């Protein structure tokens, strides 16, 4: 700095991750001149920020700080495409979905790769932090060629170290570091933290991975390893069934319905996620299906509850606001590396599931949420500022869409905090077996800030060894829900590269329009992928109006 004072930036505009502030970036050009003649130059983009972590927590779990402020990690695991058949289009789509979901950190799982320069560029722009692991997992303890491995570490760090999104280095997934790695990293980049493997130094082992009763997330019994809604969990997840179009692309019709267990288990890692067993049993709690179309639609309902229950339980226990101290969750995992019946937020073919949109709702920066176990309503704030005199409203509707309960509470939201159990919903004794909950959060001026919607049954939760409970069973009567009348209008806009379809839906009936799915189809009636929906798999209350925008590249319409 003394020799080159132009490198000093006074009062810099800082780079922040999702919800915490803007993603300010600077452009830098460096030139080398000899005798006044430029002989080489390089351009780069960078951001100014500080990310550190420590274990000064009640349970010694790792907690991260960005620009001096504590950061609750709501992240996920990124799995590369199985055959490494990536492209800028695929990278853009998956990172755009990631940003839409609301997560703030992507863990580059140790069984994967270091992604492209374009990947890191987009993470910088989108505010997505990156936890980079180095290509070893539990079944690959050490590289065959240490020198080659160290050379790859060095070249990778040099390539990605200028990106503000790069937050943390980890030597391996559930394995051990190669001797000399910490020293090399410190030499190349002393600005970022490092740990030798993914389950140490304040990050405990993961789970659950498979389908469980959604009630278990609230009860903290979802993992056979004991409490896992606590501390920093690097792998905690649940599956979602793909849409029926994806299932048809994946297997023959004869294997789709009735479900051919052998084929489905093959496409589920030998039945690892229990898609042909427990997932199917939970879907059947919505009533036995007569076709794969009906089954797949009900499967989206379960996938939505899977995701919502996980994220909202971690919201409730954010940092030191809940029943247990929680510093971070990395969902296992959110993108699919290959076609599989245990999908996630989107399928390998880039077709989103209900999980994406219900995760996005759960991770909105100001969020009201319901606890199926406690029957309470809490409000979460992910901004670094407080909000006073907000009002949360809880409404309950029966199967005939009649409002049978309403209560509100005024809440003062602490900066980056939670108001837990702001009110308790008292369900009428004679309420219908299946009913609905609508939550509305209003600001101090009475303007709607966010909303949330749930379906619930009267079934009693009988423990973790059962598939019972108000989030898990007793939903057969959903088939009795009267059909709503929804009017639809749309307009098409375009820019140089994309089409935008603005769809306005209005529920003109007195019935709840339940779990509506929009699809953008080509002339062959096939979904156009990737397309970006601002929302999907949503419900509309009587009289409610909603606008959804669908965006797709113009080149995607060339095939009709």
Label every PLM stretch briefly:
Residues 1-106, 114, 316, 320-326, ...:
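Secreted/periplasmic carbohydrate-active enzymes, especially glycoside hydrolases
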Residues 112-114, 136-138, 174-175, 200, ...:
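Active-site-proximal loop/turn and secondary-structure-junction residues that shape catalytic pockets
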Residues 40, 154-264:
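Active-site region of glycoside hydrolase catalytic domains
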Residues 31-33, 118, 122-126, 159, ...:
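Alpha-helical structural signal in soluble globular domains
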Residues 94-97, 119, 149-152, 156, ...:
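A general structural detector for well-ordered alpha-helical segments in enzyme core domains, enriched
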Residues 221-395, 404:
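Substrate-binding clefts and catalytic carboxylate motifs of secreted carbohydrate-active enzymes
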Residues 13, 37-168, 268-304:
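Active-site-adjacent substrate/metal-binding segments within catalytic domains
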């Amino acid at each position: 700095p003394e020799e080159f004072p132009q490198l000093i930036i006074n009062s810099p505009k800082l780079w922040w991750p999702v919800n915490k502030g803007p993603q300010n970036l600077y452009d830098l050009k460096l030139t080398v001149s000899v005798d006044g003649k430029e002989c080489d130059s390089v351009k780069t983009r960078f951001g100014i920020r500080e990310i550190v972590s420590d274990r000064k927590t009640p349970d010694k779990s790792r907690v991260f700080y960005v620009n001096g402020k504590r950061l609750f990690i709501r992240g996920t695991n990124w799995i590369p495409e199985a055959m490494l058949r990536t492209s800028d289009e695929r990278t853009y789509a998956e990172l755009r979905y990631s940003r839409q979901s609301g997560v703030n950190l992507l863990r580059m799982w140790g069984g994967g790769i270091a992604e492209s320069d374009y990947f890191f560029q987009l993470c910088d722009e989108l505010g997505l932090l990156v936890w980079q692991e180095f290509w070893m997992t539990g079944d690959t303890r050490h590289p065959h060629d240490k020198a080659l491995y160290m050379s790859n570490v060095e070249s990778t760090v040099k390539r990605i170290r200028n990106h503000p999104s790069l937050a943390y280095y980890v030597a391996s997934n559930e394995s051990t570091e190669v001797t000399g790695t910490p020293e090399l990293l410190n030499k190349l980049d002393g600005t970022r933290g490092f740990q030798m493997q993914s389950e140490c130094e304040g990050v405990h082992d993961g789970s659950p991975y498979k389908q469980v009763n959604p009630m278990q997330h609230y009860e903290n019994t979802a993992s056979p390893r004991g409490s896992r809604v606590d501390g920093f969990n690097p792998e905690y997840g649940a599956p979602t069934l793909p849409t029926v179009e994806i299932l048809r692309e994946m297997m023959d019709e004869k294997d789709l319905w009735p479900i051919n267990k052998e084929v489905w288990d093959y496409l589920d890692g030998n039945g690892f996620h229990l898609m042909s067993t427990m997932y199917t049993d939970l879907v059947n709690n919505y009533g036995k299906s007569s076709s794969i179309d009906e089954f797949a639609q009900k499967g989206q309902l379960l996938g939505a509850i899977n995701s919502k229950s996980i994220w909202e339980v971690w919201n409730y226990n954010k940092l030191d606001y809940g029943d247990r101290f929680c510093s971070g969750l990395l969902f296992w995992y959110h993108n699919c590396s290959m076609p599989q019946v245990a999908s996630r937020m989107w399928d390998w073919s880039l077709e989103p599931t209900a999980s994406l949109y219900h995760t996005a709702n759960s991770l909105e920066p100001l969020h009201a949420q319901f606890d199926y176990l406690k029957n309470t309503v809490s409000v979460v704030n992910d901004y670094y500022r407080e909000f006073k005199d907000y009002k949360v409203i809880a409404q309950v509707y029966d199967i005939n869409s009649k409002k049978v309960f309403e209560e509100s509470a005024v809440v003062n939201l602490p900066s980056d905090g939670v108001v837990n159990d702001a009110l308790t919903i008292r369900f009428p004794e004679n309420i219908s077996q299946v009913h609905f909950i609508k939550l509305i959060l209003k600001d101090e001026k009475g303007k709607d800030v966010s909303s949330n919607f749930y379906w619930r049954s009267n079934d009693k939760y009988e423990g973790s060894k059962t598939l019972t409970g108000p989030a898990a069973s007793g939903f057969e009567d959903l088939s009795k829900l009267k059909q709503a009348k929804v009017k639809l209008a749309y307009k098409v806009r375009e820019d140089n590269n994309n089409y935008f379809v603005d769809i306005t839906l209005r529920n003109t009936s007195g019935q709840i329009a339940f779990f509506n799915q929009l699809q953008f189809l080509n002339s062959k009636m096939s979904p156009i992928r990737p397309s970006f929906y601002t929302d999907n798999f949503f419900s509309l209350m009587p009289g409610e109006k909603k606008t959804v925008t669908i965006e797709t590249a113009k080149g995607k319409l060339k095939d009709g």
